[in-house]
């Protein structure tokens, strides 16, 4: 399946909306923030009651580190880094991460099954693990936490295992959602109407 540029943008918004709605429906209050993206991403963040912040560049790992440090500076108790392409994420997955943190006394990480990357990481204030996202980052993050003596739990929630990085991921996601084409077309039409 090959998506047009408009369809790729639409898919990104579909997935981001799922992530933000999952955050907004957790049993524990989590303040959603979105870092970076275009005006559509900013609009989606606003629509889903998330705070939007600009991306000041330097690559994804620097952007994540800057966002985490910024949150720590304003005494946020902890931060969960979630990519916007978690199509199967649900509120229970996020609640499970929070529970595994044992009242924010340990960091929590979730593996991307397909490439060994990191699909989520919860870092309580004072437990910064230097971001090293990308293929194989799950093991890197575990190693960095170990070096820094940060206690770490692993979350195996199903909705955190799958992200859309490869064509076969898109096919699997499409097959799992009976409304995929309808929702994608709705978003594509909406983007074209502006």
Regions found by a protein language model. Name each.
Residues 124-145:
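Short, glycine-/small-residue-rich phosphate/pyrophosphate-handling segment
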